[in-house]
């Protein structure tokens, strides 16, 4: 079984408007409310693949109850740690080809709750094949929290796929316990390296060979429409993807994480892991809904992806 962790989940609310008018009333005909957060996007895709997955993280209040009820409707297994504060809302306004987002920061998590979740989390680890940790940390949680979670996974010899950014990622990179996989994009890589990282193969190879990534088995860098660049052990790969009609790119990174997680659990080869991850990322981009893939198109895209050692 695979475990996904979303420390700062949300109720994602989507409003579709022909035009967003400022300083007046905008009436919405259709509203979509779905369980949100990067880890839950990963969960949905793994579930669609037919993988055995359990969703976890922090939930609180009536919105937390709503989120669990929505997961139940989708037959997604979950085991969340309950906190006293309310789970957040995140609003996306789709208007005239644009997307304006209003994101609540999320609940405050007490020191007692932070400690409690680590104990709760450790009890979930036996018999797990892979843990995927995604997204931001809520207020109140120590900035090295992901490092603590990774250390616990290491004690139980469970591989970890980590998809986060900013200070939380830097803490992990500078810490003793390393994840199995990280998935930065070039912007995030530039922040880590404190210099501009382009899509150039030589530049990427030099960056990923930096000592800051020592101990991390896989580094998979998203290059958007240009595919991906990866380092596994001491081997580098360039992944070339076909051109597709993009409908909604939001969540494509999470779908890629789902592919990585699924392939790791299956013991897939390097080529199969990279092709599966990128196929699912593209499939997500072809759909209106975030964290959804049309598997009827899977084989067609999979066969068009090229993985070359460089």
UniProtKB/Swiss-Prot annotation:
A family per Pfam: PfkB
Record has Kinase as a keyword: yes
Catalyzed reactions per annotation: D-tagatofuranose 6-phosphate + ATP = D-tagatofuranose 1,6-bisphosphate + ADP + H(+)
Source species, domain of life: Bacteria
Spans traversing the lipid bilayer: none
Pathway: Carbohydrate metabolism; D-tagatose 6-phosphate degradation; D-glyceraldehyde 3-phosphate and glycerone phosphate from D-tagatose 6-phosphate: step 1/2
Xref: NCBIfam families: 1-PFK, lacC, PRK13508.1
Name of this protein: Tagatose-6-phosphate kinase
UniProt record, GO biological process: D-tagatose 6-phosphate catabolic process; lactose catabolic process via tagatose-6-phosphate
Gene Ontology MF: a single term: ATP binding
Family: Belongs to the carbohydrate kinase PfkB family. LacC subfamily.
HAMAP family: LacC
Record key words, sorted: ATP-binding, Kinase, Lactose metabolism, Nucleotide-binding, Transferase
Claim: Transport is one of the keywords in the record: no
């Amino acid at each position: 079984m695979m475990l996904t962790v979303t420390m700062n989940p949300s109720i994602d609310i989507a409003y579709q408007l022909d035009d967003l008018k400022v300083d007046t009333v905008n009436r919405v005909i259709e509203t979509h409310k779905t369980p949100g957060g990067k880890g839950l996007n990963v969960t949905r895709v793994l579930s669609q693949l037919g993988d055995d997955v359990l969703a976890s993280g922090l939930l609180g209040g009536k919105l937390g109850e709503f989120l669990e009820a929505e997961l139940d409707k989708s037959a997604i297994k979950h085991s969340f740690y309950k906190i006293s504060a309310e789970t957040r809302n995140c609003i996306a306004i789709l208007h005239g080809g644009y997307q304006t987002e209003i994101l609540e920061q999320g609940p405050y998590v007490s020191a007692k709750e932070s400690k409690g979740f680590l104990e709760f989390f450790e009890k979930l680890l036996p018999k797990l094949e892979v843990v995927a940790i995604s997204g931001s940390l809520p207020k109140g949680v120590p900035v090295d929290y992901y490092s603590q979670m990774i250390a616990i996974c290491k004690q139980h010899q469970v591989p970890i796929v980590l998809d986060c950014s900013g200070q939380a990622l830097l803490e992990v990179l500078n810490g003793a316990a390393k994840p199995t996989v990280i998935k930065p994009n070039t912007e995030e890589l530039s922040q880590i390296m404190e210099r501009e990282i382009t899509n150039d193969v030589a530049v990427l190879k030099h960056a990923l060979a930096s000592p800051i990534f020592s101990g991390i088995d896989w580094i998979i860098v998203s290059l958007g429409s240009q595919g991906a660049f990866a380092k596994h052990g001491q081997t580098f790969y360039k992944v070339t993807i076909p051109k597709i009609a993009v409908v909604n790119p939001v969540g494509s990174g999470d779908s890629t994480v789902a592919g990585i997680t699924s392939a790791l659990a299956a013991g897939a080869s390097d080529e199969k892991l990279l092709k599966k991850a990128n196929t699912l990322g593209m499939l997500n981009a072809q759909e209106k809904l975030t964290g959804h893939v049309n598997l009827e198109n899977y084989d067609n895209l999979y066969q068009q992806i090229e993985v070359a050692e460089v």
